Amino acid sequence: MRWNTVLFDLDGTVTDPKEGITCAVAYALRQQGIIADPDTLTSFIGPPLHESFPELFGLTEEQTDRAVEDFRVYFSRQGWAENIPYKGMAELLESLQGAGLKLVIATSKPEEFALRIMEHFGLAAYFHRICGAQREDLSLIHI
């Protein structure tokens, strides 16, 4: 059987999200007077923010809600642009597309940010669809 579609995640597959996520977390924590060791902030990559802030820094529910909001403020301003495409990704995508495959992004990142990131790095044109979380879903996932 020949496959005709290749499904990609965004963070950790197409782009390295470390800089944008860790800087956004550091910003959110600073808003609450917490200065964190940068090495601990990589633990925020992957799990939902609403779990990571209380687990790693002991934030209350109210503090966590505020930290998540501050994270989103930073991320929407500049954190999204701090993603870095992995070396060779454009060439890989071009090759797959040239082989007649449909390429799709499926991410828990809000779709507006996924689109912005892919367009910023000139990668959006390789994809048939870029699918992410919708705005109303944001309380359930991390960015």
Predicted regions and their residues:
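Conserved small/polar residues in nucleotide/adenosyl-binding loops
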Residues: I141-I143
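Conserved hydrophobic residues forming the short capping helix/wall of the S-adenosyl-L-methionine
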Residues: L29, M118, G122
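Conserved H-loop
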Residues: I35, L123-H128
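N-terminal helical cap/lid subdomain that shapes the substrate entry/recognition surface
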Residues: R2-A90, A99, E112
